Amino acid sequence: MALAAARRLLLHAGSRLGRREAVDGARRFANKRVLVETEGPAGVAVMKLRNPPVNSLSLECLTEFTISLEKLENDKSIRGVILTSECPGIFSAGLDLLEMYGRNPAHYAEYWKNVQELWLRLYTSNMILVSAINGASPAGGCLLALCCDYRVMADNPKYTIGLNESLLGIVAPFWFKDMYVNTIGHREAERALQLGTLFSPAEALKVGVVDEVVPEDQVHSKARSVMTKWLAIPDHSRQLTKNMMRKATADNLIKQREADIQNFTSFISKDSIQKSLHMYLEKLKQKKG
């Protein structure tokens, strides 16, 4: 309950959260974990995740992300957003496992509600969303990219992307699955979800997880050129088409939100799942050590 109240307070204070300043004709506002730079005449904002070391989507990060996105949605001068990372070598490691391990059911429910909220806002946004994937993008990081209208990925063999939840001993929910199927087709999604496949840039391009792979130093310039192409389309026709393509998938979650939260809370609270998460987190500690 306290978490929910804190989030409502932050959202209510969204217009005051973070600092605003003008930089070389551009406007910017920043929260602790998200930096947004906007270019008024161009109608484009660049949203940078900066939650080091790996841009994990903690409850605080999800809240700040949602607030930043809400600000941009309410700014009628902004037509498109380029989503990228400020952390070297990582786009986003996805959901924060520490939010799903060793907590109480109320925390799990609140966390999952925030994950749902961010996904719905991204996936149904009227703005043009282009992801400049400049690092590794597993699990929830891949989810963020899949929400975008176009995905540009750096051609670096060290970077991978995919919904690899099964490798962690957890299951991607139905709305992750639905979006994956929409993007790469049923058979590819079925195989990738069961195996927890992390695709190299070339493999991701081949199956359709990303739309373009470019040299690492060209990711942002390519994202901008792609954005220019999309901005040439009248907003009303593009937005109606996007809504037509995505509404059924979004509605499928909307009508089952509470049940999905209950299912997640029940699943993640199981001793066997907590044990799997513990083992995975211990492996991560050993790698860091």
From Swiss-Prot:
GO terms for biological process: fatty acid beta-oxidation. The keyword Mitochondrion applies. Residues 1-28 form a transit peptide. Gene3D superfamilies: 2-enoyl-CoA Hydratase, Chain A, domain 1, 6.10.250.170. It is found in: Mitochondrion matrix. Pathway: Lipid metabolism; fatty acid beta-oxidation. The record marks E165 as: Important for catalytic activity. The modification N6-succinyllysine is found at K48, K71, K222, K229, K255, K270, K275, K283. The modification N6-acetyllysine is found at K48, K76, K222, K229, K255, K270, K283. InterPro entries: ClpP/crotonase-like_dom_sf, Enoyl-CoA_hyd/isom_CS, Enoyl-CoA_hydra/iso. Its main location: mitochondrion. Substrate binds at A93, G94, L95, D96, L97, G140, N164. One of its GO terms (cellular component) is mitochondrial inner membrane. Keywords: Acetylation, Fatty acid metabolism, Isomerase, Lipid metabolism, Mitochondrion, Transit peptide. It catalyses: a (3Z)-enoyl-CoA = a 4-saturated (2E)-enoyl-CoA; a (3E)-enoyl-CoA = a 4-saturated (2E)-enoyl-CoA; (3Z)-octenoyl-CoA = (2E)-octenoyl-CoA; (2E)-tetradecenoyl-CoA = (3Z)-tetradecenoyl-CoA. Coiled coil: none annotated. GO terms for molecular function: delta(3)-delta(2)-enoyl-CoA isomerase activity. Key enzyme of fatty acid beta-oxidation. Able to isomerize both 3-cis (3Z) and 3-trans (3E) double bonds into the 2-trans (2E) form in a range of enoyl-CoA species, with a preference for (3Z)-enoyl-CoAs over (3E)-enoyl-CoAs. The catalytic efficiency of this enzyme is not affected by the fatty acyl chain length. Belongs to the enoyl-CoA hydratase/isomerase family. Homotrimer. This is Enoyl-CoA delta isomerase 1, mitochondrial. It comes from Mus musculus (Mouse). The gene is Eci1.
